[in-house]
């Protein structure tokens, strides 16, 4: 198998929604094209992660552009589609040059593929129908002529299209009834003939020698032969699905048994010598792995985070599957009370691959895919401490990507939002838990009239629109046409980091605390790289999701700067105990003042939510910090971790590390925890 890469690029992929309840979301994946497969992988920190899916080149039937939807966001301006035997994949390139390159490379590789489409759908499949023709079935015939078809279909290498030799036991049917005189079912019928002696295949004209022949109507799913013989078995060939191989059955007690087990319907017409057998539509055994569709898959969650979530569940056999630190590998994390431990124990089982590329946890039980492996072990422990009983999900009813209205604001319909309960309150109003369209959980920040100027409101909304990162709270839209104004964001179920530390901190390991700091650092590194200053980074302004991922929130004071520096107006309120010296002396903000605040946040995390400088008021803090006083080492922080947070508190901003440098310092401390 040729695994040499032809083309690699980070592209945006739309979920295929193979299940009715699957979310319609968009994710960046590293796409890799080889001679045999188009695969896509997770990609993080310049490293290829686990494979998320793969399509065999020989199964691809069409590759073409897709017409843009109305009000398409900037990042989805260059879509193309890949139609293959088992589905439809939409991919978005970053520019026209990239899209053209992928179309050219893919069309080159699928040249001569069987069953290329003459027509395709030029519009997206959205909300249960194609936008181009309004057909509601994803497998519906295309409505637009595919211009590339003629070139890709006719330029076929003879060797590539030659039928492989059938086994010797293939049944020969004497050509007693001329094929051309048979009742042809329809123009869409594909006629295949195979000469078992000359090893050649023919089109509609029959050869002179005896042939094994089969005729298949791809619309009605019927197969036509020359004589009704129920000791025969008609098998669709893997390489040419509309061609059928005719075999003698090895044994059968009666023709009725064979008929009942191999056909749904049989119609015999002896006057025309035509057989019509209906077969159920076959399904591919090589199912594409889309693990994100399964509740038990947690993705890039760490070992310590998985242990915390499983212990919170506290049920015998609670489990999840996560990406291993070894690229492309998976780990099953499983909770049990079987061991003499009051808290229970969590075991981590690596998913191994044998010489035949089968997956297993216990060597005697091997499977083609992760879902099949998990299904088996949900019923059999097979060497594990207990069987997999209760999947622990890290997924929630998240909102699909927002739909831009094209004017820089996402305006949502107020009547589509139902307010459920108050989550908290602040200087500008209250935050409520809500349901959007009766389905999706959202947080609604309700801005009281007069509490925020219109300019301030649009400043915060526009800032949030520009920021999209897994470690930043997602912005969904606004309701700005009447008061109270709504700012609608992602709902984060475990609330603010500060409260979580105070209520759950005693059950957290130092490695889990470090993971929380790393999450925040990732979000801040993103802001830093896009020249945004947060100005109010603290544990109270970060939120903890149900998978224990921590996300940076509260962008009310965030500013975009051209030179990494912002001077605030006199009289502006700021959080003194989280502020760098240049802030409380000169009102001067930069990403390095955010770094100072991050050091304070790390201290909050490792002290489980204590108030920094708790013995001093604000004026005393200004004096102490100006004199060189710094916070002490929390007892849960190692010397190495304390050195990292202490480096954030250098008096000179230029001597403090960047967030990217902080990530590099924390990463080695996480490595031992990721197995």
Curated annotation (Swiss-Prot):
It is found in: Cytoplasm. Signal peptide: none annotated. Its cofactor is Zn(2+). Residues 4-111 form the PH domain. It catalyses: L-tyrosyl-[protein] + ATP = O-phospho-L-tyrosyl-[protein] + ADP + H(+). The modification Phosphotyrosine is found at residues 216, 224, 566. It is an enzyme of class 2 (transferase). Residues 417-675 form the Protein kinase domain. Keywords: Apoptosis, ATP-binding, Cell adhesion, Cytoplasm, Kinase, Metal-binding, Nucleotide-binding, Phosphoprotein, SH2 domain, Stress response, Transferase, Tyrosine-protein kinase, Zinc, Zinc-finger. GO terms for molecular function: ATP binding; non-membrane spanning protein tyrosine kinase activity; protein tyrosine kinase activity; zinc ion binding. Phosphorylated in response to protein I/II and to LPS. Phosphorylation at Tyr-566 by SRC and by autocatalysis leads to activation and is required for STAT3 phosphorylation by BMX. Its EC number is 2.7.10.2. Changing residue 566 to F: Abolishes almost completely the SRC-induced phosphorylation of BMX. TEK and vascular endothelial growth factor receptor 1 (FLT1) stimulate BMX tyrosine kinase activity. Activated by integrins through the mediation of PTK2/FAK1. Activated by TNF through the mediation of TNFRSF1B. ATP binds at residues 423-431, 445. A zinc finger (Btk-type) spans 113-149. This is Cytoplasmic tyrosine-protein kinase BMX.
